[in-house]
């Protein structure tokens, strides 16, 4: 009986230690408690010896991976990392809404810039204008949107604005329409301090260019700088002028694309009665630069001549490239007119020269020239006679008294449209001999005139002598 109780007690005691080992193994996955010889816990057999059970040893082992379980802790998603946005505007020295604006000629342009670090007592802003991006004073074309540090305004610019005008160097050159007392004012800067708005009242070829914004503290006004480029564009105005031609002259028409900018490319395509003109010898195009932009003139000459068929209708198509990606296209049309070739005759009747021109348009008149004199002779009346049978034309006649000094006479028609060649008639006539009595009268008049002139000179000289003598005597009496 006693031995049975002892055995039962030893068995219960062993079971208790096995339970403790299992609990400790589950509670600490990083440590394994072994009983008896070294080895894995799964291979160690529990010993019933009280001596072995009373002296357990612990051996540290590397952590073992745990099997995945369906617990909530294992299925929870990790927290997302905090989002990092752009830096705050307060850390940026400037922020402009437009660094390369392109606007129409004559429009009003606004450029807004923010200066987060500015204060009312320390902030100073200057804006300078340069004609072009590659100005010799600037050097290479500056980078837009780049903020430069400790860079003063390059030489050669014109000052547009200074927030501290009392500190402006008196030797600076103000841009036209800027500075104290400018009228009319072309530039203005408005808005609260730190949020400045540059306003260009009228964008032209003179007000476009590179604008350099330089700012900083009052004692360090060139701390930062940035460039803004302002560009202007001006679409061309298109006009067509079909030339009036005389019978036998080739038809012509001229198209003009005027005052456009920039002058990249202005291309003309010509059509005559709906058919394109391909022969480059028939088209002459020339471009010139003016103070207000560029102008291109293109003239087409037809192979057909007036009077041998109906008048021709010309169409010019203009393609203007504003930049490398934008272009506009316009058309203009007109019909040429044909004028009859006039007949001009000259005759001398008595003491007059008579010039007659038939089939001239309304508004045409005469101009007379004598000898080598390039200036017209005295104005003479022009009489219009009957029509020559064509609508809008008439026969006109003019008379001119003959000259006693000249023998060559030119009768020229004036008032024809541009492009019509000079129409004139030349004639010769010997001046008639003068009447002897008339010559004597002329000589008598000339002699009388000379005598009167001499008499007037003598009277004036005598009066001067008398006046000087009287003045001298009066002065002598006063001295005595």
From Swiss-Prot:
Source species: Human herpesvirus 2 (strain HG52) (HHV-2)
InterPro entries membership: GA_GC, Ig-like_dom, Ig-like_dom_sf, Ig-like_fold
Name of the protein in question: Envelope glycoprotein C
Membrane topology, as annotated: Single-pass membrane protein
Miscellaneous remark of the record: There are seven external glycoproteins in HSV-1 and 2: gH, gB, gC, gG, gD, gI, and gE.
One Pfam family of this chain: Marek_A
Ranges per topology, Cytoplasmic: 469-480
Transmembrane segments: 448-468
Residue ranges, Virion surface side: 28-447
Gene3D superfamilies for the chain: Immunoglobulins
Signal sequence interval, chain numbering: 1-27
Function: Major attachment protein that mediates binding of the virus to cell surface heparan sulfate or chondroitin sulfate. Also plays a role in host immune evasion by inhibiting the host complement cascade activation.
Keyword Metal-binding attributed: no
